Amino acid sequence: MDWWINARIATLDPDAQHAYGLLESHALGVAHGKVEAIVPMSEWDGDASDNITDANGRLITPGLVDCHTHLVYGGDRAAEFEMRLQGVSYADIAKQGGGIISTVRATRAATEKELLQQSEKRLLALLREGVTTVEIKSGYGLDLESELKMLHVARRLGQRYPVNVRTTLLAAHALPPEYAGRSDDYISWICEEALPVAHEQKLADAVDVFCESIAFTPEQCRRVFEAAQKLGLPVKGHMEQLTLSGGSALAAEFNALSVDHVEYLDEASVQAIAASGTVATLLPGAFYFLRETQRPPMELLRKHKVPMALATDLNPGSCPLASMRLMMNMGCTFFGMTPEETLAGVTRHGAKALGMQDRIGHLAPGMAADFIVWDCQHPAQLSYEFGVTGPHQRVFHGEIHNV
């Protein structure tokens, strides 16, 4: 048995009666990659054969879960960022070949090796801040070869580094140039070719859509969801980011894992996702980077007890920010979340948004031994401070993996 002793443990146990599920002066026992026991130090009786690490009063939390990223992509859009700051409109940038299509071109042109090398830098930035589980979407290929290439890279990242990687097929992200004016045909291609092939090759753990006036209609997204459902794949969606599209209510019909962004959710939609057990994933980094003003309906989400996850939305266009700790601070400062809500959002609720709540996201006997020993004592510091208190140890499947 491996033990971490003299620790303050924020278990994030959903059944805990006290804030953060915080346990003072406890020991955490690990065996075979799972949590074996959590006991008060007054009851701990270590064996001479045990491997013991003294936390010296440090805080232990579950490993962080980034449940919404687009971290596999080619190129960057720094020049476009500069143009926007100089007053050039997004429409004009797009006319000059910028916007999402510029990332599609760069991603299509990159070899799998090049894409892996570019993407692993972004992944490592997340791991160094305490992430032990990450979701990675496709969506910058928009043709079969390139979408599969992105998903292959995501799988390889999970094999190469100490992190759980969940992959999501997001072919319904934007309309590729070759389908201009034929969005229904593109949706047919997703349903009849891209989705079945990705599923057959075991490259997709879930299916995502972008339901918005600038992307795809609820009717088109329904077709994708129905095709995913037939294959037994869970669904999720970029919903209500720019307008009230009805996408979240649609997602609730399919018991979606999550609806993400959700700045324009109305109460009827909140009630629908509450009834379906769907997580609302909040993405304050995109809100900040795009200088939006409409924040998610926090009081409605609380009123109807919708679990709120928090994620980076790491992507080249609207949030090139690889920091979960920054997202926690932004969740508090921009969206009015409490530090306890943000920590639950990047652990327990993030796990639920990936359908992994039975394995990760809180600390209890039988759960995966994915946790962080922090150089701080109180969990509120993780949202309060940024760039100050980092991981002292990063434990993945019961083994120390500092990266």
From Swiss-Prot:
Gene designation per UniProt: hutI
Question: What does this protein need as cofactor?
Answer: Zn(2+); Fe(3+)
Entry's localization field: Cytoplasm
Per the entry, the cofactor note is: Binds 1 zinc or iron ion per subunit.
Spell out the CDD domains in the cross-references. Imidazolone-5PH
- Give yes or no: UniProt keyword Hydrolase: yes
Cite the binding residues for Fe(3+): 68, 70, 238, 313
**GO BP of this protein:** L-histidine catabolic process to glutamate and formamide; L-histidine catabolic process to glutamate and formate
GO terms (molecular function) for this protein are: imidazolonepropionase activity; iron ion binding; zinc ion binding
The positions annotated for binding N-formimidoyl-L-glutamate are 140, 315, 317
Any Pfam family from its record, for instance, is: Amidohydro_1
| Annotated binding of Zn(2+), by residue | 68, 70, 238, 313
Protein name (Swiss-Prot/TrEMBL): Imidazolonepropionase
Q: Please provide the record's keywords in A-Z order.
A: Cytoplasm, Histidine metabolism, Hydrolase, Iron, Metal-binding, Zinc
Quote the EC number: 3.5.2.7
Reactions catalysed according to its record: 4-imidazolone-5-propanoate + H2O = N-formimidoyl-L-glutamate
Where does this protein hold 4-imidazolone-5-propanoate? 77, 140, 173, 241, 318
Family designation: Belongs to the metallo-dependent hydrolases superfamily. HutI family.
Per the record, the pathway is: Amino-acid degradation; L-histidine degradation into L-glutamate; N-formimidoyl-L-glutamate from L-histidine: step 3/3
The role this protein plays is: Catalyzes the hydrolytic cleavage of the carbon-nitrogen bond in imidazolone-5-propanoate to yield N-formimidoyl-L-glutamate. It is the third step in the universal histidine degradation pathway.
| Protein transport among keywords | no
Organism of origin: Hahella chejuensis (strain KCTC 2396)
Q: Which GO terms describe its cellular component?
A: cytoplasm
Leader peptide range in chain numbering: none
